[in-house]
Amino acid sequence: MSLKHITAILVLTGMLFSSNTLADDLSDVMKVIQQYGDLENDLAAQAKLMRSDRVYISGGARQTDEAKNMANQITGRQAGESLNGGKTIFVTMIEDPEVSIYGKTAVASFVRWWQVYPHRKPSNLSPPTWVTLVLVKEKSKWLIAHTHISGVGGN
């Protein structure tokens, strides 16, 4: 077999495996996005999707201490539920996710809103928000390193 044939086989093999890896990574990132939404009712479990150095930007505030950020979110949720007299249920809708993968880094952008069911109160639909996540692959697991949330124009 000539050097040209060997080179061609190696290049084609590399292309075959890299496209499969990209497809697997895309599927894995999409699963993390879905879990991120599905775990809105369990913020402690949702926190396991985050890197310890995650940056969180929302409502004009930037938080770089992930442990304190999650503690604040959990405490805020508990305080709201205490005022409502019971658990609030969040049903998360994620629409039109777009994901780009750059090696071990992924950028995801999507629209998110919640149907919120407070205890003993009427349900309400939150305004839609843009969510951008930056995920980093550590070993075989994708974790959220950066979250940016902002209102969709006109809200």
Question: PLM features: what roles do these ranges have?
Answer:
Residues 115-125, 153:
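Short, cysteine-centered beta-strand-loop-beta hairpins and adjacent loop/turn segments enriched
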Residues 90-92, 104-114:
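A short hydrophobic beta-strand element
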Residues 26, 43-102, 123-126:
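A solvent-exposed, acidic/Ser-Thr-rich amphipathic alpha-helical stretch
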Residues 33-41, 53, 58, 77, ...:
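Sec/Tat-exported extracytoplasmic proteins
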Residues 50, 112-114, 148-151:
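Short beta-strand segments enriched in hydrophobic/aromatic residues
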Residues 99-107, 122, 135-143:
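A short, structured loop/turn motif at beta-sheet edges
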